[in-house]
């Protein structure tokens, strides 16, 4: 659209008065060609609206005013020319009627009565339209769920969360955080709309007339066809019950003010990012652990160092803090809207009270029909949350070094030459470099030390001494041979080659340290000043090297969480398997370091069969190593690997009881876990009814019985509403998490639909418990879940009240728990006082325990339990 300074001008491609007719076009100086006479479907005036070379046949109701005609014209511009639309288009257009009998061909339409049947009305852009008007094009933002990692196009940071992570513009397709909504400039390009501009408004049943005409459509049809294409205002508090919620960018007045500001070059400073961020110039990820890129100190623009020279000089100065929205604009948003936009928690998961999203599957064109059917239910499927990503163990280790090596030992002084291959777990001595047959394996976990050549008593007379020694508990290996004055002797004997093997073995013994922190020249890599804290006997020893006590396997990644990576390991002397959490101090701030120390301090004070055992902690200037007992797997793995994607009631009762008993011990010591979820419930064995232990106390807090805390902790998918709403919370926070764990165990889905407020869903039991699978689950289980998922903390069940619930007080569950206690050799779940009660129960049942209704409830699950046991064994 081009503004006409002195006389009205047509919209794109429109010929003005007195201009020659375009080739093959229409001569507007002569009477227009006879238009097809299509009878109007009802009372009203039918006429053509022409914009450039495009005509649309519309039907105007008889009682309509000129404003209605202008709205139709704006709708056509949005549909046919989205790149030409701008803010305030309605006030900047004029309507002219073609009158071939008049000296002035175009007659200004001043009212709807001026339009007669069959007229041709030209839409013309007024000369009052300014350059700023063309630049202001508001976004039409809707809440969107992303199935792949996405980044905010305003701040460059990743959109975090399971579902509803951010906002997507219906016009240009750009993505934004909800918290960035009020800072987004109104610069929608309409790229997505432009793909639709070649279709007619009545595309479902239209026939093109001439080059650009279509069948008539009524005003209602035209409005409906363009509803989804027009930028919409955010909903007011009175319309909060609508099926969809929309956001717009910053106020138009602010955009006009910023356009008048002088744009200056950016002031870039090197910046370290704590969240994944993309360069806003090239849209590529800023890679690295720290100092990844440059950030403008005024407008916070992020880019690579190499892209800084290509960034235009368009800095608008210091960004407004909480000042982007005037009071009158903020008044249009409900309180729930404001809290959901300003709350940092929205990047981590589902938030009670946040905006809903209608027909999630309909907004994602790339999804298949199968997913659409699943999404129509609206329940979030159970998955491993982003904060605790599980990794599988690689079957084959990476070869670190290989080659021919000469060696002998204190058990056999005969010198041998084998092809050595070093990987992350062992040294394998092959017969040659082409066969799989090997002579010996030396596990790295059995190596106690690698020392320079010291013992020469076994060197045969007249032979060259060895270069270094590998010391294990039973055997000492003497490796290499030092040829006199020949640094590059035969293969496997050269001093340089053997020294390379010594260095490689030292690095393999503690490779996790050396991944990010190369040692200084002349300094032994893994010999660092360290502090060892033994939890079992509370001994603190200085200058203890973890490599002398444990072997860590870097290719056996057990998991990764908030504070670091968990590797498999082995105690060198006893051969006991352990799990080692390795944390790089340089990668997290002091606050998270204090959380780690908090976890260690809590685990030091806990000794319970239902809580993971912490052995010791090692600390170096660069890293922290937390050594714990290694378990078989986690509860989430058991749920996802089951045949139906959920657990039978009998097994769920067995596991939930153990979780509650462990929580009772924690709460007795005034400790609240704060991050309870299936990933943090570990299985001690592959048995179908395993012992479980709680782990990951990084978020745990010391909270008294009647005390409250306000700091935000935990994983949002399992957190209670009071935490997500920044209200005070107490130990009942863990009980909400138990309710969610119980729900996902029995159903395989999270209990909340993403489209409604949690409070509303809890009060609507029919919505929370759909027939599949809850029609096959007992009412007692549903009753316990309802009492755990109580929004009001005072109504939520405690640990003791949950353990006393009839659903858990079942004879078969008691038998399963007693069998587990018999295997463990310790009674810590059940109590002796219950024996008499269950003996009386058996006597009343005529000595046939678990018969009748109890036995009938358990028999159908035998097949499921057998299949689940097989899957756990495979895992």
Curated annotation (Swiss-Prot):
The keyword NADP does not apply. Its main location: cytoplasm. Residues 14-35 have a biased composition (Pro residues). It catalyses: L-seryl-[protein] + ATP = O-phospho-L-seryl-[protein] + ADP + H(+); L-threonyl-[protein] + ATP = O-phospho-L-threonyl-[protein] + ADP + H(+). It comes from Mus musculus. The active site is at 675 (proton acceptor). This is Serine/threonine-protein kinase D2. The modification Phosphotyrosine is found at residues 87, 408, 439, 718. A zinc finger (Phorbol-ester/DAG-type) spans 138-188, 265-315. Its cofactor is Mg(2+). GO terms for cellular component: cytosol; Golgi apparatus; nucleoplasm; plasma membrane. InterPro entries: C1-like_sf, DAG/PE-bd, Kinase-like_dom_sf, PE/DAG-bd, PH-like_dom_sf, PH_domain, Prot_kinase_dom, Protein_kinase_ATP_BS. It holds the Pfam family PH. The modification Phosphoserine is found at residues 30, 197-198, 200, 203, 206, 211-212, 214, 244-245, 519, 707, 711, 873. Phosphorylation of Ser-873 correlates with the activation status of the kinase. Ser-707 is probably phosphorylated by PKC. Phosphorylation at Ser-244 by CSNK1D and CSNK1E promotes nuclear localization and substrate targeting. Phosphorylation at Ser-244, Ser-707 and Ser-711 is required for nuclear localization. Phosphorylated at Tyr-438 by ABL1 in response to oxidative stress. Phosphorylated at Tyr-718 by ABL1 specifically in response to oxidative stress; requires prior phosphorylation at Ser-707 or/and Ser-711. Interacts (via C-terminus) with LCK. Interacts (via N-terminus and zing-finger domain 1 and 2) with PRKCD in response to oxidative stress; the interaction is independent of PRKD2 tyrosine phosphorylation. It comes from the Eukaryota.
């Amino acid at each position: 659209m081009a503004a006409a300074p002195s006389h009205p001008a047509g919209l794109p491609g429109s010929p003005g008065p007195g201009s020659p007719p375009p080739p093959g076009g229409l001569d507007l100086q002569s009477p227009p060609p006879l238009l097809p006479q299509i009878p109007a479907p009802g009372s009203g005036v039918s006429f053509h609206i022409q914009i450039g070379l495009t005509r649309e046949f519309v039907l105007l109701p008889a009682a309509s005013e000129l404003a209605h005609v202008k709205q139709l014209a704006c709708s056509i511009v949005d549909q046919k020319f989205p790149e030409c639309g701008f803010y305030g288009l309605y006030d900047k257009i004029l309507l002219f009627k073609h009158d071939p009998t008049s000296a002035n061909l175009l007659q200004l339409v001043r009212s709807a009565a001026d339009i007669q049947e069959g007229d041709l009305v030209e839409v013309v852009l007024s000369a009052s339209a300014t350059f700023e008007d063309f630049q202001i094009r508001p976004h039409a933002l809707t809440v969107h769920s992303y199935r792949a990692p996405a980044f905010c196009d305003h701040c460059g940071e990743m959109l975090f969360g399971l579902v509803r992570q951010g906002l997507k513009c219906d016009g240009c397709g750009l993505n934004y955080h909800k918290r960035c909504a009020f800072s987004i400039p109104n610069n929608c390009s309409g790229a997505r709309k432009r793909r639709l501009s070649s279709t007619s408004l009545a595309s479902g049943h239209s026939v093109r007339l001439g080059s650009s005409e279509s069948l008539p459509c009524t005003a209602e049809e035209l409005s409906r066809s363009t509803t989804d294409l027009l930028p919409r205002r955010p909903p007011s508090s009175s319309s909060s019950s609508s099926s969809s919620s929309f956001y717009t960018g910053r106020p138009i007045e602010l955009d006009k003010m910023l356009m008048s500001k002088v744009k200056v070059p950016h002031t870039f400073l090197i910046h370290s990012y704590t969240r994944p961020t993309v360069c806003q110039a090239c849209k590529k990820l800023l890679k690295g652990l720290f100092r990844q890129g440059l950030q403008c100190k005024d407008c916070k623009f992020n880019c690579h160092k190499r892209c800084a020279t290509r960034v235009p000089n368009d800095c608008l100065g210091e960004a407004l803090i909480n000042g982007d929205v005037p009071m009158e604009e903020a008044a249009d948003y409900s309180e729930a809207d404001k809290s959901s936009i300003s709350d940092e928690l929205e990047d981590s998961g589902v938030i009670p009270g946040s905006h809903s999203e209608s027909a999630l599957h309909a907004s994602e064109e790339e999804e298949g029909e199968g997913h659409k059917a699943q999404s129509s239910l609206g329940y979030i499927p159970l998955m491993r949350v982003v904060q605790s990503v599980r990794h599988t163990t690689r079957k084959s280790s990476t070869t670190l070094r290989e080659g021919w090596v000469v060696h002998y030992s204190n058990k056999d002084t005969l010198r041998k030459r084998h092809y050595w291959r070093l990987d992350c777990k062992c040294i394998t001595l092959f017969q040659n470099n082409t066969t799989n047959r090997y002579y010996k394996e030396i596990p790295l976990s059995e190596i106690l030390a690698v020392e320079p050549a010291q013992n020469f008593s076994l060197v045969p007379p007249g032979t060259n001494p060895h270069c270094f020694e590998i010391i294990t508990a039973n055997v000492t290996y003497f490796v290499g041979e030092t040829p006199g004055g020949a640094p590059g002797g035969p293969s496997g004997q050269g001093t340089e080659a053997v020294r390379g093997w010594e260095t490689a073995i030292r690095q393999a013994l503690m490779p996790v340290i050396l991944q990010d922190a190369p040692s200084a020249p002349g300094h032994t890599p893994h010999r660092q000043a360290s502090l060892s804290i033994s939890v079992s006997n509370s001994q603190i020893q200085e200058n203890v090297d973890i490599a002398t006590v444990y072997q860590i396997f870097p290719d056996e990644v057990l998991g990764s969480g908030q504070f670091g990576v968990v590797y498999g390991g082995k105690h060198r002397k006893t051969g006991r398997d352990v799990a080692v959490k390795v944390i790089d101090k340089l990668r997290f701030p002091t606050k998270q370091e204090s959380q780690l120390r908090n976890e260690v301090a809590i685990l030091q004070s806990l000794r319970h069969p239902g809580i993971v055992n912490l052995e010791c902690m090692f600390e170096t200037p660069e890293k922290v190593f937390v050594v714990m007992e290694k378990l078989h797997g986690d509860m989430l793995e058991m749920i996802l690997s089951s045949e139906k994607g959920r657990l039978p009631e009998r097994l769920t009762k067995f596991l939930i009881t153990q979780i509650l008993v462990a929580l009772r011990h924690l709460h007795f010591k005034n400790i609240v876990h704060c991050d309870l979820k299936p990933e943090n419930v570990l299985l001690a064995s592959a048995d179908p009814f395993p012992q479980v232990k709680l782990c990951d106390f990084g978020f745990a807090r010391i909270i008294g019985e009647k005390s409250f805390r306000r700091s935000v902790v935990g994983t949002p998918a399992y957190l209670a509403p009071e935490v997500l709403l920044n209200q005070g919370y107490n130990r009942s926070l863990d009980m909400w998490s138990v309710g969610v764990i119980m729900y996902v165990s029995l159903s395989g889905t999270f209990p909340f639909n993403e489209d409604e407020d949690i409070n509303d869903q809890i009060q609507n039991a029919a919505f929370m418990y759909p027939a599949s699978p809850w029609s096959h689950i007992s009412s007692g289980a549903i009753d316990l879940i309802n009492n755990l998922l109580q929004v009001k903390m005072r109504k939520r069940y405690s640990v003791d009240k949950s353990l006393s619930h009839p659903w858990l007080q079942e004879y078969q569950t008691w038998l399963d728990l007693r069998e587990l206690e018999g295997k463990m050799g310790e009674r810590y779940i059940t109590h002796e006082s219950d024996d008499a009660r269950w003996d009386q129960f058996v006597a009343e049942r005529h000595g046939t325990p678990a018969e009748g209704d109890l036995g009938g409830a358990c028999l159908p699950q035998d097949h499921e339990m057998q299949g689940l046991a097989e899957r756990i064994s495979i895992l």
